[in-house]
Amino acid sequence: MPAWPEKRNYIGSHAKRIDAPANARQRARLGRLSPKDVPISELGGEKIEAVLTTAPGDGNPIGGIKVVTHDGWFAARPSGTEDVYKIYAESFWDHDHLRRIQQEAQALIAQVLQAAP
């Protein structure tokens, strides 16, 4: 992480979406994930603060999973129209931190989908 945390508010956030191939079985599994399916305690070098499968405001299912830290997050959800899943990620630090979040998110989702029945 950058040495100057106070600068994060001046730099702004960095975000990106990644698409990855997934068959129908894997997409269905991703849509049914629960917080207990996330076997990690850190993301991007930070403690995970929340693992969400429902929207905080209205409690509706988000159709995937969102993992949140103090300075970043990712959400993964299956596409409804293509044989892919999408990872949305954001870092409040920099592009390197964003890449780390993306890599760890991809590894986690690949691990979970590989175990799909």
Language-model segments: what does each one mean?
Residues M1-P117:
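Phosphate-binding and adjacent anionic-ligand microenvironments
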